[in-house]
Amino acid sequence: MRHGHGLRKLNRTSEHRLAMLRNMMNSLLQHEVIKTTLPKAKELRRVVEPMITLAKEPTVANKRLAFDRLRDRDMVVKLFAELGPRYKARPGGYTRILKMGFRVGDNAPMALVELVDRPEIEDTTADAAKAE
């Protein structure tokens, strides 16, 4: 019986699952928005939120813990320099999962995972069209 086990296996071995979640976490921290399947998005949220909470306190020990989980120096720098201060006053709930319908090939439920309060990127094509 598997009572009390909240982890989704996602039809992968533990090594594959951990590597996939690490890659997805790096992508989310880099781009601040990614598209994936709904079960993966829900698991990703469980991994990313504690990382951002860790970044709110920029100690050497926390940076080493973050590097141990991310394995990417650039993402650790971004996490502690940008994301930690951005969410300093927010007590959790750093990610948003938006359902996006179903994938064409296999009808898998898709979702958009994004960091809340991310800066809006201005669309230069819309500004150019307005100018004309």
Curated annotation (Swiss-Prot):
SUPFAM superfamilies: Prokaryotic ribosomal protein L17. One of its GO terms (biological process) is translation. Keywords: Ribonucleoprotein, Ribosomal protein. InterPro entries: Ribosomal_bL17, Ribosomal_bL17_CS, Ribosomal_bL17_sf. Gene3D superfamilies: Ribosomal protein L17 (3.90.1030.10). Belongs to the bacterial ribosomal protein bL17 family. PANTHER family: LARGE RIBOSOMAL SUBUNIT PROTEIN BL17M (PTHR14413:SF16), RIBOSOMAL PROTEIN L17 (PTHR14413). Part of the 50S ribosomal subunit. Contacts protein L32. This is Large ribosomal subunit protein bL17. It comes from Polaromonas sp. (strain JS666 / ATCC BAA-500). The gene is rplQ.
